[in-house]
């Protein structure tokens, strides 16, 4: 007669303990990586280096640097476009590296319940 309850293949308490330990390790790794990423900064330029924007891992703009040549009072729109482009590129770099870092940790899930693709 088949046993009811429990997981196929046996020792449920041991398997659950191992899963919990693995989940706790992974949570700690993700917390550590998140703190590490928040302390980092990413930089991007636009207009051939005329505009440089630096963002943090907290998704905050840290600095905007403009070369004198790009500041034209008669063409403010171009300057605005360059700032937006550099900011978006810096944020894209940050997001890409953050996602890659989290996927390297979450990859251990092996798409467990579809969670492996969350990051």
From Swiss-Prot:
Q: Which GO terms describe its molecular function?
A: DNA binding
**Per the record, a Pfam family?**
YbaB_DNA_bd
Instruction: Report whether Cytoplasm shows up as a keyword of the record.
Output: yes
Composition-biased stretches (Basic and acidic residues) = 28-42
At the top level of its lineage, which domain of life is listed? Bacteria
Q: Which UniProt keywords apply?
A: Cytoplasm, DNA-binding
Give the start-end ranges of region Disordered. 23-45
The family database entries (SUPFAM superfamilies) matched by this protein are listed as: YbaB-like
Q: Which GO terms describe its cellular component?
A: bacterial nucleoid; cytosol
Give the subcellular location: Cytoplasm, Nucleoid
Q: Entry's InterPro entries?
A: YbaB-like_sf, YbaB/EbfC
What the record says about family reads: Belongs to the YbaB/EbfC family.
Quote the NCBIfam families the UniProt record gives.
DNA_YbaB_EbfC
Known function: Binds to DNA and alters its conformation. May be involved in regulation of gene expression, nucleoid organization and DNA protection.
Note the subunit structure.
Homodimer.
| Protein name per UniProt | Nucleoid-associated protein Cphy_0047
């Amino acid at each position: 007669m088949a046993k009811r309850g429990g997981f196929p293949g046996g020792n449920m308490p041991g398997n659950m303990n191992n899963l919990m330990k693995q989940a706790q390790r992974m949570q700690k790794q993700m917390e550590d990586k998140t703190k590490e990423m928040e302390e980092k900064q990413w930089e991007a330029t636009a207009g051939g280096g005329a505009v440089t924007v630096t963002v943090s891992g907290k998704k905050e703009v840290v600095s905007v640097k403009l070369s004198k040549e790009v500041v034209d009072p008669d063409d403010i729109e171009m300057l605005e476009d360059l700032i937006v482009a550099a900011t978006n590129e810096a944020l894209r770099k940050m997001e890409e590296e953050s996602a890659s870092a989290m996927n390297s940790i979450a990859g251990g899930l092996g798409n467990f319940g579809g969670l492996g693709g969350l990051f």
